[in-house]
Amino acid sequence: MSLKLEVKTEIKLDYQDFQNQINEFHKRINDKNSPDIIFLGWNNFPEVAINPQEIARMRKIVENLHQNSINVLVVIGIGGSYLGAKAALDFILGLGPFENKPEVIFLGNSLSSTDLYQKIEYLKTKNFAINVISKSGSTIEPAITFQILYQFLIDQIGEKLAKTRTFVTTSIKSGELLEIAKSNELEIFEVIESIGGRFSVLSSVGFFPLLFAKINVDEIIQGAIKAHKKYSTSSISQNLAYKYALFRFLMYKNFNYKTEILISYEPFLIYFNEWWKQLFGESEGKNLKGLFPASAIFTTDLHSLGQFIQDGSKNFFQTIIYIKKPKFDLGIKKLVQFNTKINKLSGKTVSEINFQAFLATTLAHSSYGNNPNLVLEIADSSPKTFGHLVMFFEKACAMSAYLLGVNPFDQPGVESYKNELAKNLGWDR
């Protein structure tokens, strides 16, 4: 997988002035004696993040489920417990619709009674299994959903069979969900203690749903291993992940930009963008610091946000992911019944037009709109590319947060709403 990075801005950026800082933080990310080693399991790849025995066990379970005509998996989780898997499924498969293929449904990521009710109604005619993902089991959204859905599954097929179709991904050390799994004799997959939720897609958290959907997990791992090696140097000129991190830092610190918009030209990247927003939002948004991570899908959002991006306030820059080779393509043929300018495009493909839109929009926004643009060109949307891109952003995120002067691996602000909600519900936390 090839990844190219191109900066389109009139702003002069001197990266080499920061090489000493990069060296220091690179050591902190990679040194076995780092004070943050308890959070760096994702970077100890594949030794810590990948458990071959557990993946083999998952494969056997998935094979058994499919043999028993269980073709729907309900993944219950919120934040990093589901965003990575959802991003991977859409990135690799596209948005469908699909016929006669295993289906993965995501629940427990909101407190919407309407969404939960409608999905349960849909499941009434399906043979489904459950994979609940939570490090502790105390997060309210997945906890409520799991309790309701597990009862529904028991009502449908009985408790004995329901136990064989329910899989728990959680800490194997302690937690409410671990106790539930043990007391009900449910299959358990491990949430690795040294890997935070937003960094966990390249682990058992993401792998079970992907295996169920018949995604080639081995290729995802191969792509991530290659990226891990590629971005293992501290040299800014040779490490694109660090160059991206430094670009973001300079936009924020030296030029006072407050927002980064991640832009993609494929609708199936919507949830990849959502995963990216959590990764950077939770890692950097603390101590009154950090770029606000926003996203858009072009050309769709050009018809809603395009005016603002071109002519509105200039407090943002754009990072663009462009996929060089589309998953599928369609040719445009002349239609004599339509006497329009579109007929002049006959012989071209839809992806060729999309590419021209990308070129035109990037030029308009960077040159005429005076918005700095950074372009990440990736080869395709294969499993290997997904693994590579995830590792690229995770390494960039850690470095970016250290440059900013914050801890990339905690999220103390999230506890505030949880504490207030607990008070409202009369809970002890």
Swiss-Prot record:
It is found in: Cytoplasm. The gene is pgi. Belongs to the GPI family. It comes from Mesomycoplasma hyopneumoniae (strain 232) (Mycoplasma hyopneumoniae). Its EC number is 5.3.1.9. It catalyses: alpha-D-glucose 6-phosphate = beta-D-fructose 6-phosphate. It holds the Pfam family PGI. The keyword NAD does not apply. Coiled coil: none annotated. Its main location: cytoplasm. This is Glucose-6-phosphate isomerase. GO terms for biological process: gluconeogenesis; glucose 6-phosphate metabolic process; glycolytic process. Catalyzes the reversible isomerization of glucose-6-phosphate to fructose-6-phosphate. GO terms for cellular component: cytosol. The active site is at residues 282, 303, 418. Keywords: Cytoplasm, Gluconeogenesis, Glycolysis, Isomerase. One of its GO terms (molecular function) is monosaccharide binding. The lineage of its organism: Bacteria, Bacillati, Mycoplasmatota, Mycoplasmoidales, Metamycoplasmataceae. Pathway: Carbohydrate biosynthesis; gluconeogenesis; Carbohydrate degradation; glycolysis; D-glyceraldehyde 3-phosphate and glycerone phosphate from D-glucose: step 2/4. It comes from the Bacteria.
